[in-house]
Amino acid sequence: MSGRISWEGWAVPPGHEAVRAIAAETPDSELIRWVDEALREKSGYTLPPKIHIVQQDGDYYNVMPCIYERGNIAMVKMIGRHSIKRGEDRSSMMGDILLYESDTGILRALMDGEYITTLRTGISAAHSARLFTRPDFETVGLIGLGNIMTVCIRAFIASLRAEGDRRDVTLKLIRYHDHQQRIMDLFREDPNVHFVLCDTYEEVIGGSDLVISAITKVTENFVTDEYFKEGCTVIPICTMGFQNCDLFFDRVFTDEMEQIRGFKYFDHFAPVTTNVTDVLNGAAPGRTDNVQRILVYNYGIAIHDLVFAANIYDRATVPDTPYRYSREKYFI
């Protein structure tokens, strides 16, 4: 993003409905632009690595701070995944975002972080898919057909069509609780999007030029090495299920090197790993031929939460909620 945010009102609380309504009015091309511009300007953000707090049974919290001095914005997001208990009516992912004036420390907004996370995660994956997939791709394999994947593949196809690219695209979908129907319904008006319904991961991944996974909990690799065709691009949105690819893929790209240093095979794939920002700014090459197998680890960076939250804040019309912080020095 460019320029300083216009802070008006006090703690504006755009909840889930408000955030969702604003996002629905924003074209996918603009959302992709937010991701792209933030990555290009990454050096202008203060971005500590996210704090990952592990709990029992695979539950966790991520704490993600970020400051953008040029925009006068500081942000922290607290988000976690927690198994749903009997009788609960909520998403397994819950999160909140706090926005502050960076030069005063005044809280300006409390926002729904779960929807923003879903949105920016899917859009980031779509951005990477456009950047690193071989230009002559035809077949896309999709695993984990929930909200993040819906955002991702919708934006990916929309960006192609917006550029006048009407090529035939085949989407290979894993059958799971009829989730595949939602993806198919997205493209009912596009005669050039075709579908193959699959019962196994081998069917989805084998022969696909682009493989995207959005499954949030995986305990083993989806398939063995031979199912990844030459020239394929693999984007594990939640970073799991493709550890075998770490050992033999030709190139690895990441949104933030520091956040993947703890991966089991990092030392093995580090020599072929490049930050996406360096590719966008011309400091390093991206895909250089149609035979490279490419792996993209977007571990999720707070600059995208900040940019999406700030842009949504600027568009919010919900009533202000007064926030009465201390205005004078006091003694206890």
Please place each PLM-identified region on the residue numbering.
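NAD(P)-binding Rossmann-fold cofactor-contacting core
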Residues: S159-F187
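Adenosine-phosphate binding glycine-rich loop
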Residues: V19-I22, C245-I332
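Active-site catalytic pocket residues across diverse enzymes, especially alpha/beta-hydrolases
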Residues: F156-L160, E226-Y227, A316
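Glycine-rich nucleotide phosphate-binding loop and flanking beta-alpha elements
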Residues: H82, I106, M149, V218-T219, ...
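Short helix-loop-beta connector
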Residues: F132-T139, K229-E230
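N-terminal ligand-binding/catalytic initiation module
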Residues: M1-T118, A126, I303-L306, Y313-D314, ...
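Rossmann-like adenosine-cofactor binding region
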Residues: N192-D267
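Glycine-rich adenosine-cofactor-binding loop
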Residues: A125, D136-S159, I174-H179
